[in-house]
Amino acid sequence: MNVLVVHGPNLNLLGTREPGIYGVLTLDRINEEISALAEELGCSVSFFQSNSEGAIIDAIQQACGACDGILINPAAYTHTSVAIRDALAAVALPVVEVHLSNIHRREEFRHHSFIAPVAVGQIAGFGADSYLLGLRALFTYIKKEIVTKA
């Protein structure tokens, strides 16, 4: 099983950017934790981070046929990008949306997600653990989907 992990804009600044909201772990450290869990689960992960909407869309499109699912933290694009939402819908892979902070406890403009309607689930508010919970959920979902199709 192959999972693409997509990190959206400004997540490259984790560890220094608003640590009271996003925590002190760097993106590299979060990726290490995701990799360790993936190994434990018996799946492989690849990572992609960009501050560019178009580059994120390209990565999502390239996942079609190469990956079994997508774990995505679209960051600010959660609330603005119909294009990323449409790319996720187009590839028709299982998607889990994750957020470090609880977007529903923050500013009103952060409460709406364009991604949620095309995701199998959303996990928010658990810091870096949101990624680990998301990977476990996606792994379980894909395994059940494989069994159902068999």
From Swiss-Prot:
Entries under SUPFAM superfamilies matching the protein: Type II 3-dehydroquinate dehydratase
Keywords, alphabetical: Amino-acid biosynthesis, Aromatic amino acid biosynthesis, Lyase
Gene3D superfamilies on file: Dehydroquinase, class II (3.40.50.9100)
Catalytic reactions of this protein: 3-dehydroquinate = 3-dehydroshikimate + H2O
Associated pathway: Metabolic intermediate biosynthesis; chorismate biosynthesis; chorismate from D-erythrose 4-phosphate and phosphoenolpyruvate: step 3/7
Single GO biological process annotation from the record: chorismate biosynthetic process
An example Gene Ontology molecular-function term: 3-dehydroquinate dehydratase activity
Residues given in the record as substrate binding sites: 73, 79, 86, 100-101, 110
Enzyme class: lyase
Top-level taxonomic group: Bacteria
Known EC number: 4.2.1.10
Role played: Catalyzes a trans-dehydration via an enolate intermediate.
Family recorded in the similarity comment: Belongs to the type-II 3-dehydroquinase family.
Subunit description: Homododecamer.
HAMAP family linked: AroQ
Protein name: 3-dehydroquinate dehydratase
Source organism of the structure: Geobacter metallireducens (strain ATCC 53774 / DSM 7210 / GS-15)
Taxonomic lineage: Bacteria, Pseudomonadati, Thermodesulfobacteriota, Desulfuromonadia, Geobacterales
